[in-house]
């Protein structure tokens, strides 16, 4: 889980660096605002994942039915959000005005989401196996 978060942060760092000068047209301004919003959501997501990991650690020490249900529900919500983001990324990747750097960022974000979803599903299965 820590590796995924570190990878996600590294991807975020790559996304923020661009060698091109800023153009001042509406599409680039929209892209800039979109990237700012994505960065905010990634930070919130990272904090949520840290909190979820703390909950799982606490659950392993003292398992309760309520905690198990809450953790599984949170994981299902995160997985659903990743699925929703995947659709947005697919639509953005179809744009013809993307440069190679933007395409790379979108592909990395999509791959990161796929990895995160896979790991969350594994963790969810592990949590479900713990007897209460």
Curated annotation (Swiss-Prot):
Pfam family membership, one: Blo-t-5
InterPro entries: Mite_allergen_group-5/21 (IPR020306), Mite_allergen_group-5/21_sf (IPR038455)
UniProt keywords, alphabetically: Allergen
GO molecular function: protein homodimerization activity
Region described as Immunodominant conformational IgE-binding epitope: 25-53, 102-132
Applications: Non-allergenic peptides identified from the mapped major conformational IgE epitope-containing areas could be used for the engineering of house dust mite allergy vaccine.
GO BP terms in the entry: protein complex oligomerization
Family the entry assigns: Belongs to the mite group 5 allergen family.
Subunit structure comment from the entry: Monomer. Trimer of homodimers. Oligomerizes in a concentration-dependent manner.
Name of this protein: Mite allergen Der p 5
Organism taxonomic ancestry: Eukaryota, Metazoa, Ecdysozoa, Arthropoda, Chelicerata
